[in-house]
C-alpha cells in the first residue's frame, strides 16, 4: 500500500457521500445578494477552514441556517441553504442555528444576529482520501473493485460498522482527520485486502491497494479446446473444502486470490472436477474435461 499525501486540498472531485441531512421542514431556497445590506436586516458572513492555521475551504461546503426554536410540529425550520464557499446571508435580526457540512464532517453553532454583519468562521479538520487498486503493475478497473472505510485500526478489538461502505475507485472521500482502515474487495469472491491509513486535515491522501489475484474463466468441455457446455453449475473450493464461489453458466468468470483451488462442474446429473492454481496477475482459462 502506498500513501502519498499531497498539498492542500484543491477543489475536489465528486464526493462519495452526500453531506449529512438534518431532519427539517425544507423551504424553497432564498438567494441573498452577496454582501447586500438591507435596512433592518443583518448579514451572516460564513467561512470554514481545515484548521486554525490552515487554509479556507474553497468548495464542497453545504451551509444550512435554521430557526433556533422548533415550530408547532417540533421541527426546526430551514431558513436558508447555501453551497458557496464564503456566503453572505441576509436575515432578519434574531436567533439562528448554523449547520455546515463538508463530506462526512460537520459542525453546528447557535448565533444571534443584530442589525450589522456577523462574521462566523468554522473549523472543519477534514482531509480527502482517494483510493485505487492494482494487481501487479495493472490498475484494477473501477467496476471490479470497491472499498469500505472504517474508523480506527483493523487491529483494534470489536466489530464496527463501516463509515463509508462502498467507495468507488478514484472518488474522493472527505473524512475527519484521524486513523482509518480500508477493506478492499476485488471481485466478489476471496480477494480481500485490509490496510490502515491516516487522514490529515487539509490534505488529499492517495492510497494504492495491491491485490494478489487473477481473473479465471471456467469451461466444461467434451475435449480440450472444445465448445463450453451450457447449463453447467460450478463450485470453486479450497483444498480444505471451503466453498469460495458458486455460479451457473458456460463461461463463468471469477476473481480469485492467488493459491490452490479445485473446480467442480455439474452438468446433466454428472460431476466433473480438476485442481488448478491461481498465479498473481496471470488471468486464464481453466478447462474441465467432461469425462
Q: Where are the predicted features?
A:
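Compositionally biased, proline/threonine/alanine/serine-rich low-complexity intrinsically disordered stretches
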Residues: 1-41
